[in-house]
Amino acid sequence: MADGSNREYLNLSTGQLVELALARGEGELTANGALVAKTGERSGRSPNDRFIVKEPGSETDIEWGSVNKPFEADAFTALWNRVETFLADKDTFVSNLEVGASKEHYQPVKVTTQYAWHQLFARNLFIVPEEFNAADKPVWQIMNAPDFECVPERDGTHSDATVIINFAERKVLLAGLKYAGEMKKSMFSVQNFLLPAKGVLPMHCSANVGNDGDTTLFFGLSGTGKTTLSADPKRFLIGDDEHGWAPGGVFNIEGGCYAKCIDLSQKNEPVIWDAIRFGTVLENVVTDENRVPDYSNSTLTENTRAAYPLEHIAQRKLDNCGAEPHAVVFLTCDVSGVLPPVSKLTKEQAAYHFLSGYTAKVGSTEMGSTAAIQSTFSTCFGAPFFPRPAGVYAELLMKRIESFGSQVYLVNTGWTGGPHGIGKRFDIPTTRAIVDAIVSGELKDVETEYLEKLNLHVPVAISGVDSKLLNPINTWEDKAQYAEFAQHLADSFKANFEKYQVPDSIKDAGPNA
């Protein structure tokens, strides 16, 4: 503390943090009681500004490249000290939190923020433990200083802002960024590196459980339906975005949800709608003159968000954990309109589609992305967050599926009857009916039809779903054009998969080019 006039606020409650955020002009209260905050020009993740410190302990285990960019250890130390000095004469907010709802696999983390609303976000998204760090593990530190401006020539950064992970020192530095999602994703990347060494598969997925204790996982990129489909009024939510799958069960890595708000409606997403109340942080959501949120307004960004603790969800699994999954769903948003709404996958096909991660960037979470929708291949359905080589995660997935006997499904939440702009997107009720059939076990032994070009088996009938939708060629008026698009998609899969060194049994499990 430089001159004694600044304060360090430790482990403040939700009410205290909201009060201080308002008093400091960091945000406004909305009509539904949530705190709305704006993040400025960076309204999404900044992948070009994310680095990992290159040090002997982790260097050989990280897949260095455009996602995991190296940062010099000496430069990190200098920048950390510089940011620490910057915060020394300012009020700061500190909480002792945990990442991972598993007694064995949690990581304790001390979160220091310059803004009160960032601390509220951290307490909503991470786990607020009854007893901090009961197992007395070494503590991670997050330091978040959004008003600090990096100088690339001096600091070795890419721009005026940065996110840097240091595994040797257990530190995460965020500087120059107001977008709060960087905090949660940085600790997800940390767990994605640490968990595989313990035989645990970290996953970019949501999870829920039924009355009988049956767990279902939903993998997918942002905007493909993870949060929406796991928030099922008939089931109990474990979590909406990040989980670990250990021998014996799955656990949430987080203690809250970070739901997309664009076009949110009470009718289609009642669980999320009801969770947005006092204590929730709304990020970049526009409000009207009466402070009523306008969820259809994307003036600031398509990537509007609500961050709330799991306590805001009535139907949730109280311990944030579940049994191993009977059903695993890969959510893909196919902009070409070629893929069927649901396919059953073999273990090898599961590994192939997990590594491929074919989907679309829908209302992308990355800074600078516009509303334009484009197809993409994102390894493990979350390429930006996985530090180790992809094969490590695919191998763990196959191991877990095989040892427990989980059934994997590929579900298309994208287009049918033509590509984006011509066809129409599967509506949420149709996808929910498919998911209901998956979780009930209806599709486990259902009769299927083989689609040769796509090398996929699709059910011939599903309760509550128009059978015409199940084989995509039936929804296209121009069958020749469908064949053309299917060929193009198959070729794209093959071209993308060439980079993977995997057994032929997995290589042969994809579409037939």
Swiss-Prot record:
The keyword Metal-binding applies. Its EC number is 4.1.1.49. It is found in: Cytoplasm. Mn(2+) binds at residues 185, 204, 241. Substrate binds at residues 45, 179, 185, 305. GO terms for molecular function: ATP binding; metal ion binding; phosphoenolpyruvate carboxykinase (ATP) activity. Its main location: cytoplasm. It catalyses: oxaloacetate + ATP = phosphoenolpyruvate + ADP + CO2. GO terms for biological process: gluconeogenesis. Pfam families: PEPCK_ATP (PF01293). The keyword Amino-acid biosynthesis does not apply. Keywords: ATP-binding, Cytoplasm, Decarboxylase, Gluconeogenesis, Lyase, Manganese, Metal-binding, Nucleotide-binding. Pathway: Carbohydrate biosynthesis; gluconeogenesis. Belongs to the phosphoenolpyruvate carboxykinase (ATP) family. Involved in the gluconeogenesis. Catalyzes the conversion of oxaloacetate (OAA) to phosphoenolpyruvate (PEP) through direct phosphoryl transfer between the nucleoside triphosphate and OAA. Monomer. This is Phosphoenolpyruvate carboxykinase (ATP). It comes from Shewanella halifaxensis (strain HAW-EB4). The gene is pckA.
